[in-house]
């Protein structure tokens, strides 16, 4: 099946698609950014102690740590 290119559609079809998308979006529940950002901040702060990117990975559990060295003589 060929890919759908919006620019190849007639104007009427483009407008139908836009109206359909807007009908979907109008049903979405929206929240204030100030409230959502506070919730996200709290979520991150509560879990930062468990985050390996913040806390780091213990040496004994680091799968990327070199196991040993190789000497070629």
Curated annotation (Swiss-Prot):
BP-aspect Gene Ontology terms: G protein-coupled receptor signaling pathway; signal transduction
Tissue: Abundantly expressed in all tissues tested except for brain.
Region described as Disordered: spans on this chain: 51-73
Lipidation (S-farnesyl cysteine): 70
Record carries keyword Cell membrane: yes
PROSITE patterns: G_PROTEIN_GAMMA (PS50058)
Propeptide span(s): 71-73
Coiled-coil residue windows: none
Subcellular localization: Cell membrane
Record's bilayer topology term: Lipid-anchor
UniProt-recorded Gene Ontology molecular function terms: G-protein beta-subunit binding; GTPase activity
Keywords tagged on the record: Cell membrane, Lipoprotein, Membrane, Methylation, Prenylation, Transducer
GO cellular component, one term: plasma membrane
Origin: domain of life: Eukaryota
InterPro entries linked: G-protein_gamma-like_dom, GGL_sf, Gprotein-gamma
UniProt keyword Cell wall biogenesis/degradation, yes or no: no
Main location: membrane
Family per similarity comment: Belongs to the G protein gamma family.
Assembly description: G proteins are composed of 3 units, alpha, beta and gamma. Interacts with beta-1 and beta-3, but not with beta-2.
Function: Guanine nucleotide-binding proteins (G proteins) are involved as a modulator or transducer in various transmembrane signaling systems. The beta and gamma chains are required for the GTPase activity, for replacement of GDP by GTP, and for G protein-effector interaction.
Name recorded for this polypeptide: Guanine nucleotide-binding protein G(I)/G(S)/G(O) subunit gamma-11
Classification lineage: Eukaryota, Metazoa, Chordata, Craniata, Vertebrata
């Amino acid at each position: 099946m060929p890919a759908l290119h919006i620019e190849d559609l007639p104007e009427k079809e483009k407008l139908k698609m836009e109206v359909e998308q807007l009908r979907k979006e109008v049903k979405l529940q929206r929240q204030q950014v100030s409230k959502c950002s506070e919730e996200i901040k709290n979520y991150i702060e509560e879990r930062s102690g468990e985050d390996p990117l913040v806390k780091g990975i213990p040496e004994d559990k680091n799968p990327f740590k070199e196991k040993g060295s190789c000497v070629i003589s």
